[in-house]
Amino acid sequence: MAPSWLFLLFIPGMVGSSRSCFPGCQCIVDNFGLFHSFSLTKVDCSGVGPHVVPVSIPLDTSYLDLSANGIKRINESVLSGPGYTTLINLNLSHNQIVRISFSTFSKLRYLESLDLSHNLLETLPDGSFLYSRLTELDLSSNKLLEVGIGAFTLKSQGRSMTINLGNNNIRSIHRGAERPVPNIHSLTLSGNDLLSVPDLHGIPLRHLDLDRNPLAKIEKESFLGLEGLTHLSLSDLPNLREVSPYSFKTLPSLLDLDLSSNPQLKSLSSDMFFGLDSLQELNLAYSGVAALPKDIMLNLPSMKSITWGENIRCSKTVKESPFHAQKGRVREEVLLCHDDYGAVPAQDVL
């Protein structure tokens, strides 16, 4: 039922009107249907103050904004009652929430998007969001030191999630065998304190962002069990000095690899790219790599473009030689490179 509401939110011709609301809040009603027979309400209570909770909301509320209110505690009793059972989107960002429990969001059975960014959360209990139907979860800019994968397990595992854990203080990500592996599609871990690539084995990730962590080395089996990964960002790692050979060999589906802005990374071996048969985009801009391996293309059969140096962009193209009486026309793959000033000979790059 909830997904059909989301679809209706974008139907052309819907009519919005205001209605009576909790003091300090604004309630906007969106009407749907030929005779406006169906409606959903968006409630904006941002910046009202900590006294706003618990807030009474209309029965047909789909969106509730409680951001920037200085809220310190949030629990099940605050997020229950008439109106809360239909919530699809809840914004609790820019508050002072220190903790949540496994029951805090247990009554929000149709919740799909939850923003808890810019709070003071230090821990996440296992099953924190178990009874929701989350597809988007923002936990960025909190005070998290370690995170258990079990926190993101949902009772209904059919829908994939996008999770943002960026800009915390995360040093480790641990997992237990007691819960099913969560269905996480995209995971952002940028701006944390990770010293090594966390064990994410078996999670059906397609996007992984590890930018701005103190990683010094990418080990050989760092990405084991992530065969479905298509986009990997390892940019702006100030301590990264080494990427081991065969580090990415377990990523046959990877399309995009970002290793830009890593000034301590001075060289790369061709074996580092072994197994990247699907890779199309490689970003090495503003890294410390002086030149690319001459046989780099042997391990990158699907490569379309490489960005390198201070803005050198190389694209792979097929060059056809003039017709030869015995050989006919010979076709070969070559790199064509250029920067902001014009063409750059490929031999200066390789």
UniProtKB/Swiss-Prot annotation:
It comes from Xenopus tropicalis (Western clawed frog). It is found in: Secreted. This factor is named 'Tsukushi' because its expression pattern in chick embryos is similar to the shape of the Japanese horsetail plant, tsukushi. LRR repeats lie at residues 60-81, 86-107, 110-131, 133-154, 159-180, 183-203, 204-225, 228-250, 253-275, 278-299. Contributes to various developmental events through its interactions with multiple signaling pathways. Dorsalizing factor which functions as an inhibitor of bone morphogenetic proteins (BMP) during gastrulation. Promotes dll1-dependent activation of Notch signaling and is required for neural crest formation. Induces endoderm and dorsal mesoderm formation by enhancing nodal2/Xnr2 activity while inhibiting ventrolateral mesoderm formation through inhibition of fgf8. GO terms for cellular component: extracellular space. Interacts with bmp4. Interacts with dll1 (via extracellular region). Interacts with fgf8; inhibits fgf8 signaling. Interacts with nodal2/Xnr2; enhances nodal2 activity. Glycans are attached at N75, N91. This is Tsukushi. Gene3D superfamilies: Ribonuclease Inhibitor. The gene is tsku. InterPro entries: Dev_Immune_Receptor, Leu-rich_rpt, Leu-rich_rpt_typical-subtyp, LRR_dom_sf. Transmembrane segments: none annotated. Keywords: Developmental protein, Glycoprotein, Leucine-rich repeat, Neurogenesis, Repeat, Secreted, Signal. SMART domains: LRR_TYP. Residues 1-17 form the signal peptide. Its main location: secreted. GO terms for biological process: bone growth; energy homeostasis; growth plate cartilage chondrocyte development; nervous system development. Residues 18-59 form the LRRNT domain.
